[in-house]
Design a protein with these regions (language model features):
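Pyridoxal 5′-phosphate
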Residues: 1-249
Length: 249
């Protein structure tokens, strides 16, 4: 379709936990000369990310997803595309020359970094990226992957045993992230009870209201397991969830 100017796709769904075939999507888009932006907020945590092998035009993610400070993030983009893009914000250090007749902009990446940077937060990005990479390499990476597979199998089966529980996103190719609803239990009520038991979950639209509309719901409970979580913690979660459900019914 000639009206399509850019394709934006999640590497991994933040609601369903499903891993999208981004490389194939990129290949199809590039056949039509359409650039592709990949949202890597979940991908940077759970997947091996090689932007050159993926051949994406842009890859973005929040720093706090890999345990850096809040208010930080990464935007990777092809140089030729970034050079063609105008600055979206004005401020110090993003200009080269300024006159009444003409303004020229600084070289990349400065033209997109107007004003005083969040340098304290930025200092946390490098060690966070190194840590995220370490969690995916060698024996550590193998152990993390094996534990994630155990958690996925256990959680999928355990949630299926809860009466009235609907799990959204059950494809094999997924990460240990589980969004669900339980009949007779409002998501925010479950979240408050779980919080009292030391369990943190997310509820609401997850910034994906059209997807909620697709499933015919207004909210979900989301349990997201990270590389440092264990099968024992998944078992504790289910124990607490069953307790919360019994309190609400």
């Amino acid at each position: 379709d000639s009206r399509v100017k850019i394709v934006a796709v999640e590497h991994i769904s933040n609601v369903l936990g499903l891993i999208n075939p981004v490389k194939e999507i990129i290949q199809q888009a590039h056949k039509l000369n359409i650039p592709v932006l990949v949202d890597g907020a979940q991908g940077i945590v759970h997947a091996d990310v090689d932007v050159q092998e993926m051949d994406c035009d842009f890859y973005v993610f929040s720093g706090h997803k890999i345990y850096a400070a809040t208010g930080t993030g990464i935007l990777y983009g092809r140089r030729e595309l970034l050079e063609a893009m105008p600055p979206y914000m004005g401020g110090g250090d993003m200009v080269d020359t300024v006159s009444f007749a003409k303004t020229t902009y600084a070289e990349l990446p400065l033209k997109f970094e107007a004003g005083t940077p969040h340098f304290i937060g930025q200092a946390t990005l490098k060690p966070a990226l190194e840590f995220a990479k370490w969690l995916k390499e060698g024996e550590i990476g193998k152990a993390v992957k094996e534990e994630e597979e155990k958690i996925i199998e256990y959680m999928t089966n355990a949630l299926a045993q809860i009466e009235g529980c609907t799990l959204y996103g059950t494809a094999e190719n997924k990460i240990p992230l589980f969004s669900f609803n339980i009949e007779g239990c409002f998501p925010s009520d479950l979240a408050q009870l779980l919080d009292k038991m030391g369990v943190a979950v997310r509820t609401g639209f997850m910034c994906c209201e059209p997807l909620m509309t697709r499933f015919g719901v207004t909210s979900m409970v989301r349990a997201s397991f990270l590389p440092y979580n264990t099968l024992q913690e998944a078992e504790y979660f289910i124990k607490c969830l069953n307790r919360a459900v019994n309190m609400l019914r």
